[in-house]
């Protein structure tokens, strides 16, 4: 699964706990590899904004996944005190925490694997997929496909979550294939349509008043 905020893959984890027959969930990151580092080493080190890379799979340009704590809660036996220690005291004091020993071993026991993909690898995967299957995929899906293939046992089915239309990432598709992707009919001429928006101050009460007046 292409992974940024850990939402889709956390949903897969919950679905598996409910009985969906999934052998492994593969977490694919881009150059912002905080989650890949955790699954490989047990070390969780959220990055500051200045350390977060701008990439060609921008929905995955996240260095502190808001859904991740939910998974670690399950991973550690739903031990609320331990979660408060890790995500409260340790993260606040050191900016990171590390699972070792039995706690780290639980990651593999929970059926998780991970990997990361670079811009060059995204472009190569988009190109290869178009050549082999006559299918154009977006950069995030390319991240998921590249990493998923690395962890796929021979003969086992691989399901890759497609997360966006390639049309939204025309520059990367053009780099990979030499042409922009075809647009769905509903998007033709969208740039020429009227744009409607309101600028609000960074004030929660102003946002509430706006919603009350317009929704």
How would you name each of these model-derived features?
Residues 1-215:
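PLP-dependent amino-acid enzyme catalytic core
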């Amino acid at each position: 699964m292409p992974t940024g905020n850990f939402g889709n893959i956390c949903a897969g984890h919950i679905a598996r706990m409910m009985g969906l027959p999934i052998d492994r969930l593969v977490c694919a990151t881009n150059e912002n590899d905080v989650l890949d580092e955790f699954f490989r080493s047990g070390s969780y080190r959220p990055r500051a904004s200045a350390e977060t890379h701008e990439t060609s799979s921008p929905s995955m340009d996240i260095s502190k996944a808001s859904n991740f704590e939910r998974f670690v809660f399950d991973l550690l036996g739903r031990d609320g005190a331990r979660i408060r220690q890790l995500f409260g005291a340790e993260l606040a004091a050191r900016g990171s925490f590390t699972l070792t020993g039995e706690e780290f071993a639980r990651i593999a026991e929970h059926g998780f694997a991970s990997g990361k993909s670079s811009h060059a690898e995204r472009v190569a995967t988009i190109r290869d997929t178009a050549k082999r299957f006559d299918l154009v995929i977006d950069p995030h899906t390319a991240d998921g496909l590249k990493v998923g293939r690395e962890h796929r046992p021979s003969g086992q089915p691989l399901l890759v979550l497609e997360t966006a239309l390639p049309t939204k990432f025309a520059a990367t598709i053009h780099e990979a294939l030499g042409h922009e992707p075809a647009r769905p009919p509903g998007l033709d001429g969208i740039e020429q349509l009227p744009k409607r928006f309101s600028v609000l101050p960074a004030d929660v009460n102003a946002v509430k008043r706006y919603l009350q007046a317009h929704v």
